[in-house]
Structure formats: C-alpha cells, structure tokens
C-alpha cells in the first residue's frame, strides 16, 4: 500500500504546475486591459496543449519595423507598449497584390500574442477588423506576374466564342439577325487573338498560285531563256524567304514543269526547223569557198571535182536562155 501511495504522489504534482502557470497568465491578461481577453486566452490555451500558449487575442499594435528580406520584425502593442516578435509565417491575411508576406512600417495591425521560445510572439496577424495587411513598400508586387494570366485569358474567350458559334449554328431556325451579328463578330475575334495563324495561309496561297501562271506567260511570250532565268530566281526567293516551304511548291510544279519542258522542246524543234536551213547554206558556201582555195596549189583532182558543178551551173543558165 505504501508503494502505491508513493506512485500516486508524482502524478499529482504536475497538475499543480499548470495551475500556477494559469495563475501567472491571469495577471498578464488582466493587465492587457481586455476583460474578455483573459478567459478567452485561458480557454484557447487549454486546447492548444502542445502548441504555443496564447497570451492574448485580437490585440492592436503598430509595426515598429519589419525586414522583408529576412522575413521578421517587431510590433509595438498599443496597450502595454511591449515589442512583440513577428515572423512572416505569422501573417494570416497578406496583401493579395504583394508577392511575399510582409507588414509595413508604422502600420496598425491586429494579432494574437503567443508565448514563444524567447518571448512573446505574434500570430494570426491581420489588419484591423480582419482586413488583409497592407504590406511593406519594399515587398515586390505581383503586377508583373499578372501579364501571363491575361495572355492566357483570350484563348479561353476564344473557345467560348467557338462554343457560342456552334450553338448559334444549331439554332439556325431562330431569327436571322442574331446569326448575322454572330457571323460579323467571329472574324473580328479571330483576327484579334491569333493574327499570325491567320496571316500565314493567306500569304501562302498567292505564292503557290502566282508562279506557274507567270511562267506560262513567259513561255508564250519569249522562246529564248527568259522563262528559264525567271524560275530559279523565284525558287531562290522562296528558299531565302521561307525555307520551310521548299517541299511544297516543287510537288505542284513538277507536272507543269514537265509540260513546260515538252513545250520548250517542241518550240526548240520548230525553231531548229526554221533556223538550220540558213546555217546549212552558210556552211555550204563556206565549204565551197574553202574547197576551190585549197586545191589550186596541191592537186588537180580536186579542181576537176570542183569544175563539174560550175559546168552544171552554166548548163541551167543556157537552158533558161533557150526558154526565153
């Protein structure tokens, strides 16, 4: 029995300690000047248990200084004129425009006082009446970071416009005026949001359509090399200006180029049929001139061979004279 009594005595001692601590906290709460704050602090201290003990709640104070970079500072309580340590993690409602949690110097703040390892600390820091804190002027704003959601916004509206347009197409039996308005609104919105995607197809179409037409005109106009000179220049223009579109144009041009080459060959044959006769006559005259010049000093055989055509030429002249 004596051993059981001894074992029961040690657990009886610890409850006395919290009673003393509660007694010590009472003057602190009563000294704060808030009659309702005392019992509120005691009731909140009981559930806190392992957490930090709450000394006072909803205390107003003025920020003495706050370092945004290090993320801590001190608040001077308006009731007891004591300095309370504040960490940036204790700020409950931060300014939504600020990127970091902070408190401005000289700002009036509402907070709860909690016992920390080295003294009183602030917790649940907000503005007076639960309003978000203004924050330090040295803290970075989020204005620069708002541009990204603004850029993402138009595509969402763009999708909504498509949905509205689809719903308008389904309701074709309705009035014609709203359909006309929807049709008028579509191109404007499409042009605003994705201008680059709309410009490229319009820029591509004339490039594919124009060159073959111009090539045909050049073929019909000149039989020389003007058409051939114009084509490689255009290809170089396409290659230099838009290298990605090299594969597209040649596929469309191959059949036309083949047809153009056939036309050129036909034209070349026609020109050859017209041009070679004068060139042959000229060559014959040259050969006739060369042949009589060479044989005189060398052999008489060649002169004999050259004489019969002269005789033959005189014979038709005589025949022409007889006919006259």
Curated annotation (Swiss-Prot):
Q: List compositional bias (Gly residues) regions by residue number.
A: 30-41
Q: Which residues carry this modification: N-acetylserine?
A: 2
Q: Which GO MF term does the entry hold, naming one?
A: DNA binding
List the subcellular locations: Cytoplasm; Nucleus; Cytoplasmic granule; Secreted
Pfam families tied to this protein: CSD
Which residues lie within the region annotated Disordered?
Answer: 1-49, 120-324
Q: What is this protein called?
A: Y-box-binding protein 1
Task: Respond yes or no to whether keyword Amino-acid biosynthesis is given for this record.
Answer: no
CDD domains assigned: CSP_CDS (cd04458)
> What's in the keyword line of the UniProt record?
Acetylation, Activator, Cytoplasm, DNA-binding, Isopeptide bond, Mitogen, mRNA processing, mRNA splicing, Nucleus, Phosphoprotein, Repressor, RNA-binding, Secreted, Transcription, Transcription regulation, Ubl conjugation
């Amino acid at each position: 029995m004596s051993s059981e009594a001894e074992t029961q005595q040690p657990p009886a001692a610890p409850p006395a300690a919290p009673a003393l601590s509660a007694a010590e906290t009472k003057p602190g709460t009563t000294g704060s000047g808030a009659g309702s704050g005392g019992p509120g602090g005691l009731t909140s201290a009981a559930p806190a248990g392992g957490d930090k003990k709450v000394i006072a709640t909803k205390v107003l104070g003025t920020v003495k200084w706050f370092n945004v970079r290090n993320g801590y500072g001190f608040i001077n309580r308006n009731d007891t004129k004591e300095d309370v340590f504040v960490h940036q993690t204790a700020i409950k409602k931060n300014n939504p425009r600020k990127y970091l949690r902070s408190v401005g110097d000289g700002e009036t703040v509402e907070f709860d006082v909690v016992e920390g390892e080295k003294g009183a600390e602030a917790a649940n820091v907000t503005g007076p009446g639960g309003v978000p804190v203004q924050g330090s002027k040295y803290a970075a704003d989020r204005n620069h970071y708002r541009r990204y959601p603004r850029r993402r916004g138009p595509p969402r509206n763009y999708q909504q416009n498509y949905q509205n347009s689809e719903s308008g197409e389904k309701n074709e039996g309705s009035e014609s005026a709203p359909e006309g308005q929807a049709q008028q609104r579509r191109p404007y919105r499409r042009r605003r949001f994705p201008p680059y995607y709309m410009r490229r197809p319009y820029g591509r179409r004339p490039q594919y359509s124009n060159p073959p037409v111009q090539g045909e005109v050049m073929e019909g106009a000149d039989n020389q090399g003007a058409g051939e000179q114009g084509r490689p220049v255009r290809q170089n223009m396409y290659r230099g200006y838009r290298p990605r579109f090299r594969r597209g144009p040649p596929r469309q041009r191959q059949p036309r180029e083949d047809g153009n080459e056939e036309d050129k060959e036909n034209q070349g044959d026609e020109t050859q049929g017209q041009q070679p006769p004068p060139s042959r006559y000229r060559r014959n005259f040259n050969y006739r001139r060369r042949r009589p010049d060479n044989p005189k000093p060398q052999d008489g055989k060649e002169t004999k061979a050259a004489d019969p055509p002269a005789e033959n030429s005189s014979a038709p002249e005589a025949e022409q004279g007889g006919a006259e």
